[in-house]
């Protein structure tokens, strides 16, 4: 059966839900798809229930979301790919790969709790990975009788956003109940429509880097019998077309060339994938074990694998979930680039004996495996599964 072509008539925007565990991110995602299906029925707008978004079996048993669920829906103005980013601290790694795919995000805060530790962590992560536009959805307002309490929670959220260099005073805050909307209460359905209008207006259409050379961080790899190997991920910049030659860069000293024989998005064939699209790219002549998560597909010659660079980093404070103690020269954490962790050692500037939580510092890094990096590439510093710093590459050294 021939696959139907993907419709590009509406601008495409990547958004997602972030926030503390059990504050209602997945319920809100379900409510958005369900209310849009009721109010703006279309081929794209189909209701998704909580269980289908929270799909993997081990997730539901623990009542927490581990994987990153992708759903699609549309408003009158736009087509959205929506990521339900996991809330639990153990799954921050997935949050980082998920948040890296958002043009904007809806921060879900339960009005009954107010901001919690992971609310803070997700705001920080959003700032780190370059999610510039946040909208707040204060959930569960039906459970709070006191108007003053709601005002207090809103002020607290705005202060927290400002603390992390978001425009806390200007960010839209929508108060509603995802569960009530999901259950069909028209007052709360109206609020979901209001939320989507706000997303349409407040999250700008992203400036896509379509004129730059292709860069596609590989998130997943699988093989299709008889057709070859597929690498999937979100195109960071540039365009990928059928018959293009691409280079597989990173984790190995030598880059490898391949030819693209197919591009698809949401299981539909495309002539080309452009920056911002989540695509699967079929590669001719590449074995399943010759490409892996953490590598990138790039325009030939546009980016090289490196092991040594200078970076400007911010080390998180204990309150932000970072280290409680300083680190010294030759500290060896993991460096998280795009979709993967690589161990590296840190050399401190001459005269700097140690780095305290909360410090900014320029460091020299040497990775144990080469990674496709360039000036301006961002990374997180992690140890034992938690983020302890964030940084940006300022200079390539080798």
Swiss-Prot record:
Its main location: cytoplasm. GO terms for molecular function: GTP binding; GTPase activity; translation elongation factor activity. Residues 19-26 are annotated as: G1. Residues 177-179 are annotated as: G5. Its EC number is 3.6.5.3. The keyword Transcription does not apply. It holds the Pfam family GTP_EFTU_D3. The keyword Cytoplasm applies. Keywords: Cytoplasm, Elongation factor, GTP-binding, Hydrolase, Magnesium, Metal-binding, Nucleotide-binding, Protein biosynthesis. It is found in: Cytoplasm. Residues 84-87 are annotated as: G3. It comes from the Bacteria. Mg(2+) binds at residue 26. Residues 139-142 are annotated as: G4. GO terms for cellular component: cytosol. Residues 63-67 are annotated as: G2. Coiled coil: none annotated. It catalyses: GTP + H2O = GDP + phosphate + H(+). GTP binds at residues 19-26, 84-88, 139-142. Signal peptide: none annotated. NCBIfam families: EF-Tu, PRK00049.1, PRK12735.1, PRK12736.1, small_GTP. GTP hydrolase that promotes the GTP-dependent binding of aminoacyl-tRNA to the A-site of ribosomes during protein biosynthesis. Monomer. HAMAP family: EF_Tu_B. This is Elongation factor Tu. It comes from Streptococcus thermophilus (strain ATCC BAA-250 / LMG 18311). The gene is tuf.
